[in-house]
């Protein structure tokens, strides 16, 4: 299947690429948000497999990556607020036009899961469900050993990148990719505080507001997903019906860990498809 890239216009005029995989029928539709530093094309196989099982999938390219025309620099800055206020609503608007009457799930991998959680609290009536994939909050105290040290180190040096080179050099740091320093300074606040709030926002992830279904999939061999961090990521969804699943070699073979699962996601797609089918029929 060729990559069917659609371009939509966000509320601030930015062009947002969507990888669109339309299925036949009226199955639940998924809008998937990538992890930090990950291009949307990584999730092509997952989207194709879900499409083959009757569920339309759109994967939203994150600003600054892949087919996005933006590249972070001194003159090109964006933040989590841009994704939440402009990009996600525009993508959902587009999906509602493409799939009228279908239930829509918002989900994401790692950072994409956090954004899904926040948006679900803001607009719970728009969504039938929320999906977390390898989604664990980055609060440094929820991690042991070298992962804790890495997070603390990144928090220490992050402000320096505002001075030079004007963006976060993830390739150099071995974590993430080239990212907007504005967004990463917000991520830094998450790391230090353990709260979803940032930049003066309070109760940004409205606790208990979303009361629908949540599927949280964790993967064995994921060093960036301790149980404490997973539960912190789910904490705003206290009013929801949360299903927790951990996939290992039996479901995923050798494709495990924080990112590698997406390269051959057969077990993951089967798990998600079963859950989406339940949403379509109202069984959960």
What are these model-predicted stretches?
Residues 246-284:
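Catalytic active-site module of serine/aspartate enzymes centered on a nucleophile-bearing elbow/loop
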Residues 226-236:
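Short alpha-helix in the alpha/beta-hydrolase fold that links the catalytic acid
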Residues 77-98:
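Alpha/beta-hydrolase active-site loop
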Residues 210, 216-218:
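Short beta-strand/loop motif that positions the catalytic acidic residue
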Residues 107-195:
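Alpha/beta-hydrolase-fold enzymes
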Residues 1-21:
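N-terminal cap/lid segment of alpha/beta-hydrolase-fold proteins
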């Amino acid at each position: 299947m060729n990559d069917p890239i659609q371009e939509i216009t966000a509320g601030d005029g930015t062009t947002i690429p969507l990888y669109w995989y339309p299925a036949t029928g009226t199955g639940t539709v998924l809008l998937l948000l990538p992890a930090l530093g990950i291009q949307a094309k990584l999730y092509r196989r997952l989207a194709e497999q879900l499409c083959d099982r009757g569920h339309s999938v759109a994967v939203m390219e994150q600003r600054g990556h892949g087919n996005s025309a933006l590249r972070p620099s001194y003159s090109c800055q964006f933040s989590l607020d841009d994704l939440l206020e402009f990009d996600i609503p525009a993508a959902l608007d587009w999906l509602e036009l493409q799939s009228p009457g279908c239930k829509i799930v918002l989900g994401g991998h790692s950072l994409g899961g956090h954004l899904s959680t926040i948006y679900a609290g803001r607009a719970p009536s728009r969504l039938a469900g929320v999906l977390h994939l390898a989604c664990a909050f980055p609060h440094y105290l929820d991690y042991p050993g070298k992962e804790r040290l890495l997070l603390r180190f990144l928090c220490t040096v992050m402000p320096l990148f505002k001075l030079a080179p004007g963006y976060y050099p993830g390739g150099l740091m071995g974590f993430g990719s080239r990212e907007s320093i504005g967004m990463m300074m917000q991520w830094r606040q998450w790391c230090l505080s353990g709260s979803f709030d940032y930049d003066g926002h309070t109760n940004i992830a409205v606790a208990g507001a979303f009361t629908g279904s949540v599927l949280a999939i964790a993967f064995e061999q994921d060093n960036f997903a301790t149980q404490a961090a997973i539960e912190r990521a789910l904490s705003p969804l206290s009013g929801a019906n949360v299903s927790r699943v951990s996939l290992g070699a039996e479901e995923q073979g050798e494709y495990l860990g924080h990112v590698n699962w997406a390269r051959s996601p057969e077990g993951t797609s089967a798990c998600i498809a079963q859950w989406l089918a339940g949403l379509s029929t109202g069984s959960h």
